[in-house]
């Protein structure tokens, strides 16, 4: 895999608060190699390590997207949800940003059935068939559509398991991470000082609570994915 330059700037990361970890009492000792200092009861993340692993992750997603691979971005907590949706839409990736439904990947046949149901209902709505139903029946179908849009809207075009999963908060999305590990799906994980860096294929040490930090990391990854897709289009 060729190493590329991704314009990862330490000053830019500091401005986004990427270096702020959790309180010193709330940490995972396995994160010790990624912590550079303590300040006012907070662990400070070593941004040199962040830059290194973010660059590796960008190389990985560029290489994968240049070969037509599919990505899933997962981040369901409020601070991450909007950034996840925006990043995924920009890079034409699948995403989950509301709630991870247990078995979404490991029980793919059930998820696929739900997606088929969702597509059928959307087609009926587009064709105007809901208007012909009795009001009560139409209301039931609309509630179903709303529920499916909330939880499956980001993966409505997914036809199989993703090739790489990007996870914004390891602890918050632990179920999703375990499913990826079970299925052998490579993962890129944004990890704060309370996480286990050994669980993901590439762990990026960074503040997973600040919107600016999350957005910066996703922006770099999305740029690499888009660059890879452009390469794939030019050289299919």
Curated annotation (Swiss-Prot):
Primary localisation category: plastid
Gene Ontology BP terms: translation
UniProt GO molecular function: structural constituent of ribosome
PROSITE patterns assigned to the protein according to its UniProt record, in alphabetical order: RIBOSOMAL_S2_1, RIBOSOMAL_S2_2
Protein name: Small ribosomal subunit protein uS2c
InterPro entries assigned to the protein according to its UniProt record, in alphabetical order: Ribosomal_uS2, Ribosomal_uS2_bac/mit/plastid, Ribosomal_uS2_CS, Ribosomal_uS2_flav_dom_sf
Pfam families listed in its UniProt record: Ribosomal_S2
Assigned keywords, A-Z: Chloroplast, Plastid, Ribonucleoprotein, Ribosomal protein
Known partners and oligomeric status: Component of the chloroplast small ribosomal subunit (SSU). Mature 70S chloroplast ribosomes of higher plants consist of a small (30S) and a large (50S) subunit. The 30S small subunit contains 1 molecule of ribosomal RNA (16S rRNA) and 24 different proteins. The 50S large subunit contains 3 rRNA molecules (23S, 5S and 4.5S rRNA) and 33 different proteins.
Entry's family note: Belongs to the universal ribosomal protein uS2 family.
CDD domains reported for this sequence: RPS2 (cd01425)
Superkingdom in the source lineage: Eukaryota
Record-linked HAMAP family: Ribosomal_uS2_B (MF_00291_B)
Lineage of producing organism: Eukaryota, Viridiplantae, Streptophyta, Embryophyta, Tracheophyta
Cellular component GO terms, alphabetical: chloroplast; mitochondrial small ribosomal subunit
GN (gene name): rps2
Subcellular location: Plastid, Chloroplast
Entry function: Component of the chloroplast ribosome (chloro-ribosome), a dedicated translation machinery responsible for the synthesis of chloroplast genome-encoded proteins, including proteins of the transcription and translation machinery and components of the photosynthetic apparatus.
């Amino acid at each position: 895999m060729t190493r590329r330059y991704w314009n990862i700037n330490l000053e830019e990361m500091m401005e986004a608060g990427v270096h702020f970890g959790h309180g010193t009492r709330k940490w995972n000792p396995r994160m010790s190699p990624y912590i550079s200092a303590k300040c006012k009861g907070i662990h400070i993340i070593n941004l040199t390590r962040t830059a290194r692993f973010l660059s590796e992750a960008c190389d990985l997603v560029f290489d994968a997207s240049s070969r037509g691979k599919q990505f899933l971005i997962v981040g369901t907590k409020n601070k991450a949800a909007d950034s996840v949706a925006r990043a995924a839409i920009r890079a034409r990736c699948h995403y989950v940003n509301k709630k991870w439904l247990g078995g979404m990947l490991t029980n793919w046949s059930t998820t696929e059935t739900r997606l088929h149901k969702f597509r059928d209902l959307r087609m009926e709505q587009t064709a105007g068939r809901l208007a012909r139903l009795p009001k009560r029946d139409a209301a039931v179908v609309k509630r179903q559509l709303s529920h499916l849009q909330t939880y499956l809207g980001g993966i409505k075009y997914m036809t199989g398991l993703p090739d790489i999963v990007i996870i914004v908060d390891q602890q918050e999305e632990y179920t999703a991470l375990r499913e990826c590990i079970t299925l052998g799906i490579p993962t890129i994980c944004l990890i704060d000082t309370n996480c286990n860096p050994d669980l993901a294929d590439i762990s990026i040490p960074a503040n997973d609570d600040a919107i600016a930090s999350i957005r910066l990391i996703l922006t770099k990854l999305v740029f690499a994915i888009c660059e890879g897709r452009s390469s794939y289009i030019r050289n299919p």
